[in-house]
């Protein structure tokens, strides 16, 4: 069992406090990056910048031909935090509602423990920006020359999970998180008076037909054995009750696990939308932005991690998870090299963490110790 010195846990809480109180939005995390650099300087860990604010720390090992990477993201979300939390964001309208402050504090704590160790391989500490918005900061890390010349044989990340109790970890070998693409459909027509629909194209009606028709993609075109989600969450037009608008915009998301079906479905979305719009007198403009791919936990590495962590924490503290339809840009690493994405329990009976991406989210900080022990055990038990 790995014991974390009390003074190191104090430092990890200090890191968390600073990061939580000073959240920054994706691709604009200047203060956060500066803070991480100061800590790495204090620990005498060399680093290089990657992208606008990403950082790759590096600890040389005895065998310099091998590298293992640990990754934490550090961007925040445009959400106003609930005011009764023990710590509060100092930036109105911005908060760490997805646990990225916790991820970074855990990785900094792990770096502090391992900085003085002689490891049999190089250890890379990836502090990544811009996870929350496309195209995601992982692209900047992967495209970095230093990363390419020290390509890891294994990359590991943790993510806060409010549905798991503190002290418990979850892993799903194989496909874990769905791919996700952004859909934007804009319909144009002549517009007109609501009392004279015969003299215009009713874009609201047309858009409604499109939303309903596209659901056949999930109910009739997708295999019943292949999880697929197509949801439109934004229906916008600037109009009023007695006006047929000239423009209507739909925005939604498409998610699945199979790359061939992913591409086929996007073709169907374009074809169905165009056919309905044009047959009803509208001109469609369709934009589908490729999002993150499917996150894949390489089974052999996932099983290795499960074995190590059960030894560290006990059989009942490491559970196997099912697939989920949310997305994560750690998936980009998983498409390139063996990867393991681990869920870190952050709730307790006395401290319900709230849901991710909500103003109520605030983790039980006892998870800091679990997270640091998790990463350290995976590194120190890997020859």
Residue ranges and their predicted role:
Residues 208-383:
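Metal-dependent amide/peptide-bond hydrolase catalytic core
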Residues 8-15, 28-39, 66, 94, ...:
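General structural feature for long, well-ordered alpha-helical segments within catalytic domains
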Residues 2-96, 101, 105, 109-120:
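Acidic/His- and Gly-rich active-site-bordering loop/insert found
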Residues 77-79, 84-95, 101-102, 117-245, ...:
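Histidine/acidic-residue-rich, glycine-tolerant segments that coordinate divalent metal ions
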Residues 69-71, 80, 183-185, 339-347:
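Non-cysteine beta-strand/loop elements that form the S-adenosyl-L-methionine
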